[in-house]
Regions:
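Flexible, glycine-rich beta-alpha linker
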Residues: 74, 113-134
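NAD(P)H-binding glycine-rich loop region in Rossmannoid oxidoreductase-like domains
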Residues: 1-26, 37-40, 54-55
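Mid/C-terminal beta-alpha module of Rossmann-like enzyme folds, strongest
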Residues: 172-228, 244
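Conserved Rossmann-fold NAD(P)-dependent oxidoreductase catalytic core, especially the SDR/UDP-sugar
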Residues: 33-75, 94, 111
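Active-site Tyr-X1-5-Lys
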Residues: 71-94, 110-116
Length: 254
C-alpha cells in the first residue's frame, strides 16, 4: 500500500459524559501505534486527522492559522495535540529555520516519506452526527431557532472539499506539514439555518431571544442533560474562523 489515512478517533463529547482518559487512550495511544507501523512500513504518505481544537479552543483575532501556539482546552483537544507532538518527535517536520543543510531536510529526503497533519474544522455532509445534525433536526421539525440574537462567524469544512484535499495530498508532491482545513466562506449559525431551510423548502423561523435568557436555559440544560447545554451553546454561537490559505497554496488551488 502507498498511504495510510488515520481518521479513527474519539469525537468531542458535547454532553461532557466521557472519561478524560478515554480520549488519550484512543486519540493519542492509537495514533502512536498506527504511526509507528507507518514508519516501519513501505507506505510513503501518512495523513493524520487531528482537529482545529488541537490548536485552539477559541480564536483570538480575525482567524486561526497554523502559526498559532497550540493551547487546547479539554481532553479532546489535548489528546489530539499530544498525538501531533508524538508524530513530530518521530518524524522530521520542517521549521521556520529549516534550510538546505538542515538535518531535518536530509532525514525527510532519505526516508522518502511525507506526513500530513490535517486540522479540519467542523465537517458537514451526509451522515453528520454532531451539532450540525442538531440544527438539521431543528429545521426538519419546523422548530423555531431561538438563538438569532447571537451574531457569529464560523468556518466549516464540506465533506466534498475535504475529499478533494485528501486526493490532492495523495497524488501531488506536497511538503510534510500541519495544514488547517476549512471552506472559503465562514457562515453565521443564522445563515446556516436559512440555507438548510432553503434546501428543504421551508420558511426559516429565527427568533432573537434574549442572550442572557438563552444562556440561563443552556446552564439548566447542562444540569438536566438536555440537548442544549452550555458547551453546545458556545459551539453554536462562537466566532471560529479558520484560514485555509496554507493548504490551498500547497495544492496549487487559486
Amino acid at each position: 500500500f502507498d498511504a495510510i489515512i488515520h481518521l479513527a478517533g474519539k469525537a468531542h463529547d458535547t454532553k461532557n459524559q466521557s472519561a478524560a482518559q478515554s480520549y488519550f487512550d484512543i486519540n493519542t495511544g492509537l495514533t502512536q501505534k498506527i504511526f509507528d507501523f507507518f514508519l516501519e512500513s513501505s507506505a510513503k504518505k501518512f495523513i493524520f486527522f487531528s482537529s482545529v481544537k488541537a490548536a485552539a479552543d477559541s480564536v483570538v483575532g480575525d482567524m486561526l492559522t497554523e502559526d498559532v501556539i497550540p493551547a487546547p482546552v479539554g481532553p479532546y483537544g489535548e489528546s489530539k495535540i499530544r498525538a501531533e507532538e508524538y508524530i513530530k518527535e518521530h518524524f522530521a517536520f520542517p521549521t521556520a529555520s529549516s534550510c538546505e543543510c538542515s538535518p531535518f531536510r536530509e532525514m525527510t529526503s532519505v526516508t522518502e516519506k511525507q506526513v500530513y497533519i490535517l486540522r479540519p474544522c467542523m465537517i458537514h455532509g451526509p451522515g453528520n452526527k454532531g451539532n450540525l445534525n442538531l440544527l438539521y433536526n431543528v429545521v426538519k421539525k419546523g422548530i423555531p431557532w431561538p438563538l438569532g440574537d447571537f451574531e457569529n462567524r464560523r468556518s466549516f469544512t464540506s465533506i466534498d472539499n475535504l475529499c478533494y484535499v485528501i486526493e490532492g495530498l495523495l497524488t501531488k508532491e506536497v511538503p510534510t506539514g500541519i495544514y488547517h482545513m476549512g471552506d472559503d466562506e465562514a457562515l453565521s449559525t443564522n445563515e446556516l439555518i436559512a440555507i438548510m431551510c432553503e434546501a428543504m423548502g421551508k420558511q426559516p423561523h429565527i427568533w432573537k431571544m434574549n442572550k442572557g435568557f438563552m444562556e440561563g436555559c443552556a446552564g439548566l440544560g447542562t444540569l438536566l442533560h438536555l440537548p442544549l447545554n452550555t458547551e453546545r451553546l458556545r459551539k453554536l454561537t462562537e466566532n471560529y474562523v479558520v484560514s485555509n490559505a496554507k493548504i490551498k497554496a500547497a495544492l496549487g488551488i487559486d
